[in-house]
């Protein structure tokens, strides 16, 4: 099977042996594999090679604690295998009841005792040992949560702008995010059979949209409400830009082909912005979503996974060809895109009042890690708020948490709890609020350098540099750190992006902008944190003295000729 040739009826055909992932998907019996047998094998804490891949479709990654890997090897022990689970939560909305349940599970049944908010607008459990995996899924199911298709070659968790002010518009957009998620979800019964003891969540094993081999590679979708680009549209394969008239949603502009993952040293891989296909009315939304997915399903590269994402398919066959195929499959003709503008993407930390009169408190959670730290019992604090809160919580794509729908009568009480547990801290700088990192060490098997554990102290050093050059609080830099080039920390949409290359070393990228509409380019390769800070000191010194009025750091680096602007990624990024 691994030598079978795949043929694709499209200009610029990809012919070659199938990637081995295609074999295992086809032989998996619709994502079942032999996962159940592996669960019963208590000799090892891990899964076999094929099931290692298949559990991703069920929302899990096999990991181990890399901090103790070498010591366990010396003791002739296998790595401390465990799984990370990412929940499926379109739009990131979770109720207080659900929150208290996941808080309890994290305390009692994970190795790290934390809840990790992620850039995919959901939460992750880390350090779940094999005996607790089925319990985890059944616990989530009991509160109406699952992890179907949050990883693997499928459409993953659908993001939606967390806009607490435009309450009615947000609700409409959120409903569409849920509809899109359900429409593109795998139909196999494998998840229910394996984890829920046969309880049915779906009714058929046919996959009319995803197909028997599912997608060539992971696929990401967003629903976004301008002017906020908090979901970072250009990091995603498919984006629906909400267009409103008189406060009501009338349709979407559709953007296709974004993505940030690359491979070090492979110039055939690159970060890429999404292309604007045009406007569609609401009633064609699901048809267009399915058409984009099935076109990528049929035309995507199944021979080389490094070039398998939608962005490469678009560049290979041409935007016009891909767009025409989507129109044919969806039975729609894209109209000219409606005007919109992105002005920023950071969360509005603090209180905001919606047009419905309810109050919303956005809490800054550094790196999304909810854990009880010395002097800041963040995880306990959120649980205490959940015990009294009458609204819901909204996880953001910036790894923060919004206490949404707060009644005026509860506002003071919730703020008191937030301050008591360190969830509200007036001393947190704007620079820190606009910095984030992926998990990386010790749990991510792909990490080449530290990210989450490196960021806090590094941001302090950057804050000192900004102060040294006399820059006010509002003048900060969108800073992202990711431990490897796969891009979970979205460094390739930052004004200053650091991409892990080796322990203690990073590639330094410059030239993104505040709104997240420009790809940064590599400025320095494989340098240490000390060297990075020296470069930042020099660059910020120039920015402080040479910039024009209100010129952002990323815009300045391009205008000053420090870095060349990336306009067409395939042509410019590695030039």
Swiss-Prot record:
Amino-acid positions noted as binding siroheme in the UniProt annotation, renumbered to this chain: 488
Record key words, sorted: 4Fe-4S, Amino-acid biosynthesis, Cysteine biosynthesis, Heme, Iron, Iron-sulfur, Metal-binding, NADP, Oxidoreductase
Pfam family of the protein (one): NIR_SIR_ferr
Record EC number: 1.8.1.2
InterPro entries the record matches: CysI, NiRdtase/SiRdtase_haem-b_fer, Nit/Sulf_reduc_fer-like_dom_sf, NO2/SO3_Rdtase_4Fe4S_dom, NO2/SO3_Rdtase_4Fe4S_prot, NO2/SO3_Rdtase_4Fe4S_sf, NO2/SO3_Rdtase_FeS/sirohaem_BS
GO MF assignments: 4 iron, 4 sulfur cluster binding; heme binding; metal ion binding; NADP binding; sulfite reductase (ferredoxin) activity; sulfite reductase (NADPH) activity
Binding site for [4Fe-4S] cluster: 438, 444, 484, 488
Enzyme class, spelled out: oxidoreductase
GO annotation terms (biological process): cysteine biosynthetic process; hydrogen sulfide biosynthetic process; sulfate assimilation
Keyword NADP belongs to the record: yes
Gene Ontology cellular-component annotations: sulfite reductase complex (NADPH)
Pathway: Sulfur metabolism; hydrogen sulfide biosynthesis; hydrogen sulfide from sulfite (NADPH route): step 1/1
Cofactor note: Binds 1 siroheme per subunit.
Keyword hit for Disulfide bond: no
Catalysed reaction, written as an equation: hydrogen sulfide + 3 NADP(+) + 3 H2O = sulfite + 3 NADPH + 4 H(+)
Cofactor: siroheme; [4Fe-4S] cluster
PANTHER family: SULFITE REDUCTASE [NADPH] SUBUNIT BETA (PTHR11493:SF47), SULFITE REDUCTASE [NADPH] SUBUNIT BETA-RELATED (PTHR11493)
Family label: Belongs to the nitrite and sulfite reductase 4Fe-4S domain family.
Protein task: Component of the sulfite reductase complex that catalyzes the 6-electron reduction of sulfite to sulfide. This is one of several activities required for the biosynthesis of L-cysteine from sulfate.
Assembly description: Alpha(8)-beta(8). The alpha component is a flavoprotein, the beta component is a hemoprotein.
UniProt-recorded name of the protein: Sulfite reductase [NADPH] hemoprotein beta-component
Lineage: Bacteria, Pseudomonadati, Pseudomonadota, Gammaproteobacteria, Vibrionales
Gene label: cysI
